């Protein structure tokens, strides 16, 4: 069976060398333009394709986010002057598709794969183009997810994870509060959602005799990774107003359960630095270790970084370094250039570590992941994703990664900024 990753073709950073990346800037900008031109050639915002959900994950809202990011970054806003026009066109189409799903309560708080993400990105674009009426409508539609997220403690298939659940909705709330000039989502609303997530995890854990104080399931599987599982849910709890004060304002029981769940997760890290896909893998003895943002260490790093920033315990930084070393060894994925399970998503690990430690080794490694995108072996052996131009599977996400390499001090994986 062919390996999931390419052998790392690069020499690692040599300590003490004076590495300059200025020569990469023109190459990165040219690569951005190439990817953007490809997206515009193959993706049309006025398409009437009924199969186009329009969501952030693989739909037009994700492409709109990419154009918004291009327009928001000092290094790239002049590179593509019509970026906001394209962002507006793609988000209009996404919102037209969202109308078909408005009556579904779960869609209102589904962020990456539902209506909530569409309206969040639209709000940011409306703010950028100074359309106050549309901004008001977008925020009203987005905020309709607050009561919808509280209708149930549990659902049959799970309602807490990042792609379609409450943790994802929280990530959208935090992002909007960061990018809009006034705080649009109140602390009370954020805390009420966090409280419900904790209650859900606590009750599920007790009902299923879980070894963790908080545990969750998605379609019957107790996932641990960022897309559907525990680590991203814990990350969003750590991002809450509970942990933005000194001392921490989380209730004692919630603080204890969150911290113990993080520490249990930490001991699951294997000798290579990776984490299991699901708790079931430990029980069954399956050795399915993936090095993706969605499953594995590349997605776990954001929760670990947030835990390190809050609790200041060295064990979290040690775990982060081990995760990064694993990604450097086995993270040059053949599944494509995307951020969910591709090269750009794994490259983001090093931008995170660079911001956290200010060590040039990690910025050097991020640049090498950028270089792989034009590597002849990668171009020959990488697979074409199902949605090759999208934000999470395709090159729209790659563009975001490249933009962030140009401004590494502000870099963040989409909707998972641990430093805000």
From Swiss-Prot:
Entry GO terms, CC: plasma membrane
UniProt protein name: LanC-like protein 3 homolog
Family: Belongs to the LanC-like protein family.
InterPro entries: 6hp_glycosidase-like_sf, LANC-like, LanC-like_prot_euk
Domain of life: Eukaryota
SMART domains registered for this protein in UniProt: LANC_like
Classification via SUPFAM superfamilies: LanC-like
Example of a GO biological process term: peptide modification
